[in-house]
Amino acid sequence: SFLCWGYFVPKFSKNVNDAIRLLRIGAPLNLIILALIIYLGPKAGSIHWALFIVSSIFLSLIQPAVGMAFSLKNAGKSLTSFNLLIFIGAFFIQWIIGIIIDIGMSFNYSEINSFKFAMLFVLITSLSSYLFFLKKINKLF
C-alpha cells in the first residue's frame, strides 16, 4: 500500500487542504474496520487486519501536512517535533493496551474480552481524535 500511496499522493495532495480533505474522507474507513474487528473478535481474520493496516495509510498524510503548514524555516523543527510526538504516542498507546489487557484478565475477563477492551480503547481514542480534528478544521475553513 505504501508503494501505491507513494505514487498517488503527489497527484492527489498538492497542498495542506488536499491532505485534510483526503484525511477527512479516509480516516473513518479505518475506524469502521477496527469496529468490525472488535465486533468479530476471534472470528476476525488476517484479511480484516490487513484491511485495517492498509486503511491506516490515510493517517500518513498528516506528516506532510504538518511540514506544509509551516514556513520553510520552521518546517524542519515542526517535523522533528511531530516525529517525537508520534514516537512517544506509539509507545504510550502500546503500554496502555498492555495495561488494559492485564487489568481485564485480573478481573477474570477472558483473554479475548480483555483484548476487545484494549481495542475498544484504541477505537474510542481514535474516534475522539478524529472528531477533534473535524472540529478544529471546521473552525479554520
Placement of each model-derived feature along the sequence:
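A membrane-interface helix-boundary motif in multi-pass transporters
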Residues: 19, 99-124
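Multi-pass alpha-helical transporter architecture, strongest
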Residues: 37-40, 117-141
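Paired intracellular helix-loop junctions of major facilitator superfamily
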Residues: 13-14, 67-76
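Helix-to-loop junctions at the C-terminal end of transmembrane segments
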Residues: 2-17, 101
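A late C-terminal transmembrane helix in Major Facilitator Superfamily
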Residues: 2, 72-106
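C-terminal transmembrane helical hairpin of 12-TM major facilitator-type secondary transporters
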Residues: 19-62
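Interfacial helix-capping/hinge residues at the ends of transmembrane alpha-helices
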Residues: 63-64, 97
